[in-house]
From Swiss-Prot:
Organism, as annotated: Mus musculus
Described purpose of this protein according to its UniProt entry: Required for axonemal dynein assembly and ciliary motility in ciliated organs, including Kupffer's vesicle, during embryogenesis. Facilitates the onset of robust cilia motility during development.
Keyword Repeat appears in the UniProt entry: yes
Cellular compartment(s): Cytoplasm, Cytoskeleton, Flagellum basal body; Cytoplasm, Cytoskeleton, Flagellum axoneme
Gene: Daw1
Sequence similarity: Belongs to the WD repeat WDR69 family.
SUPFAM superfamilies in the cross-refs: WD40 repeat-like
GO biological process, one term: establishment of localization in cell
Name assigned to this protein: Dynein assembly factor with WD repeat domains 1
Subunit relationships: Interacts with IFT46.
PROSITE patterns, alphabetized: WD_REPEATS_1, WD_REPEATS_2, WD_REPEATS_REGION
Key words, A-Z: Cell projection, Cilium, Cytoplasm, Cytoskeleton, Flagellum, Repeat, WD repeat
A Gene Ontology cellular-component term: cytoplasm
SMART domains in alphabetical order: WD40
Tissue-level expression: In early mouse embryos, expression is limited to distal, motile ciliated cells of the node.
Length: 415
């Protein structure tokens, strides 16, 4: 085995190794999920070299520099103050969702006007209008990290695949018998998965446009789906109160997670795929062992439905957003509530961590989005100006741009 090159992955922090084995080029990753700006670099480099035989003494200096660069990234933009950069009167009817490509260079908006629009983040200019759906465009996504394709899921029961560069439609995926309300690309960008009100999810081949497999078994609509980091498994959350883990290649049901007593609002894996987090209208989140499917813990404290939940990039922290107008941060290991975020005057429908993991972004029906300090729970900034409910908001991959989408038909770029 011969080490060819070392590459960086910023969020979550890691070093990718490209090496040659038996004439073949292979890759493996060293995950540095515990890395913080205060980590002692020399100690960590020593630990990395002990654990990874490919990294010999001659690479010590290079690895030290890489770890220092990762630390710099964790410090970057962490005290960023956002200002309103652009208001885009994006659509003639309300927006449904916003999504950014990994580079943050462009973003997309879905709307009740049956279109999806592609925007240039730097200028706020419209690049393309993706037309062709015959009903609301509800679920939208880029095939990150590549960002060269866009998927749109519609109430017209179809999903379309588009070129992000030209706006050309590659495929229309037909087969669902009711509205498509969620979708996701697998990490390899070879498959797109769609979840529907028809109680099924379908996986589609991006190259040939064919249906790969249908995931059947839920008794009510599927409103949440996501792949694990490897793309081998997919989870679906349903209004039937259950979450199912499936084998993505065969469509076989691996586990059914039963425990919630109301509709599921979100379901996702943590980074290392050891845990599954499920949020529900029963006011709780639950944690499950991703390998065995066994129940691990319940996160309690909210007084109303949980509308969104997420892990930070490393999987150490969990954030929950509720109709009770508060958000909470939990430690994923101890399952204790670390901080409570109070200040919104309406339900919080969206929550996400910045890539560095020290800030949270929330969007609310009180027409504001807010930036919070994860450790203290203090509100650092209120992003004001929308004249109706904010139901979609997102950080870019660097954490220095925020996009908000509102029922007021506009979206705003904050930077």
């Amino acid at each position: 085995m011969k080490l060819k090159s070392l590459l960086l992955r910023y969020y979550p922090p890691g070093i990718m190794l490209e090496y040659e084995k038996g004439g073949e080029l292979k890759t493996k990753s060293i995950d540095l999920l515990e890395l913080s700006p205060s980590t002692d670099v020399n100690t960590l480099v020593g630990e990395i070299q002990q654990a990874e035989p490919l990294i010999t003494a001659s690479r010590t200096k290079q690895v030290r520099l890489l770890v220092q660069r990762l630390q710099e990234k964790l410090r970057q933009h962490s005290d960023h103050n956002f200002y309103l950069f652009k208001v885009l009167r994006a659509h003639i009817l309300p927006l449904t969702n916003v999504a950014l490509n990994k580079a943050g260079s462009c973003f997309i908006t879905g709307s009740y006007d049956r279109t999806c629009k592609v925007w240039d983040t730097a200028s706020g200019e419209e690049l393309h209008t993706l037309e062709g759906h015959k009903n609301v465009v509800y679920a939208i996504a880029f095939n990150n990290p590549y960002g060269d394709k866009i998927a749109t899921g519609s109430f017209d029961k179809t999903c379309k695949l588009w070129s992000a560069e030209t706006g050309k439609c590659y495929h229309t995926f037909r087969g669902h018998t009711a509205e498509i309300v969620c979708l996701s690309f697998n990490p390899q960008s070879t498959v797109v998965a769609t979840g529907s009100m028809d109680t099924t999810a379908k996986l589609w081949d991006i190259q040939n446009g064919e249906e790969v497999v249908t995931l059947t078994g839920h008794l009510a609509e599927i409103i949440s789906l996501s792949f694990d980091t490897s793309g081998d498994r997919i989870i679906t959350g349903s209004f039937d109160h259950t979450v199912v883990v499936w084998d993505a290649s065969t469509g076989r049901k691996v586990h059914t997670l039963i425990g919630h007593c109301a509709e599921i609002s979100s379901a996702l894996f943590n980074w290392d795929c050891s845990l599954i987090l499920t949020g529900s209208m029963d006011k709780t989140c639950m944690l499950w062992d991703a390998t065995s499917g066994k129940y691990v813990a319940t996160l309690t404290g909210h007084d109303d439905e949980i509308l969104d939940s997420c892990f930070d990039y490393t999987g150490k922290l969990i954030a929950t957003a509720s109709a009770d107008g508060t958000a909470r941060v939990y430690n994923a290991t101890t399952r204790k509530c670390v901080t409570k975020l109070e200040g919104h005057e309406g339900e919080i429908s969206k929550i996400s961590f910045n890539p560095q993991g020290n800030r949270l972004l929330t969007g609310s029906s009180d027409k504001t989005a807010r930036i919070w300090d994860v450790q203290t729970g203090q509100c650092l900034q209120v992003l004001e100006g929308h004249t109706d409910e904010i139901f979609s908001c997102a950080f870019n991959y660097k954490g220095n741009i925020v996009i908000t989408g509102s029922k007021d038909n506009s979206c705003r770029i904050w930077r």
